[in-house]
Amino acid sequence: DLMLLCLEMLREDSACLKRWQAQFRYILVDEFQDISPVQYEIVRLLAAPENNLFIVGDDDQSIYGFRGASPESMMRFLTDYRAAEQILLDVNYRCHEDIVNAAGRVIAENRNRLEKNILAAHREGEGIALYTCANEEELRKNLLESLLQEQRNGRLTRCAMICRTNFACGLWAQVLHGAGIPYVMREK
């Protein structure tokens, strides 16, 4: 693995480490919650001895555990760099208050996280609907019924569907096409 070899080289060859440390006066890491322990150690070595390290991340948004990412890196950073200033961006400008509050209640159940209370910039909303489905077929039926109702009410343009995989998008495209519901598919 390239990262392991890189880490090994930086640990064992002090001249190499010094050369690379001299290359970077400042280091910025975005999406820090998605780095692995090996990547954390590489960044830590490169940032030394100046420790001019700027990280951006949200431990509640870590989604790459299957790739070795560890949101605990956020907590470790606060321990390893006690002099670092922490700036909390605690206002959500994308979603209305009902969504932010519901998400906050779900996320609060995470056992290992940095404490934070996110507020919504947009107060008014139409609430959220929660469906509990026994299986995929029931999910498709309920969602399709909701979309058809939105279409009848002339509000289909307010709807969006986010799928985790391209395969799921393909299945939903077939369902929507079969029901006569117009849609546009985009990546990202």
Q: Model-derived features: where do they sit?
A:
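Conserved helicase NTPase motor core
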Residues: 1-76, 91-95
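Helicase P-loop NTPase motor core
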Residues: 82-85, 90-183
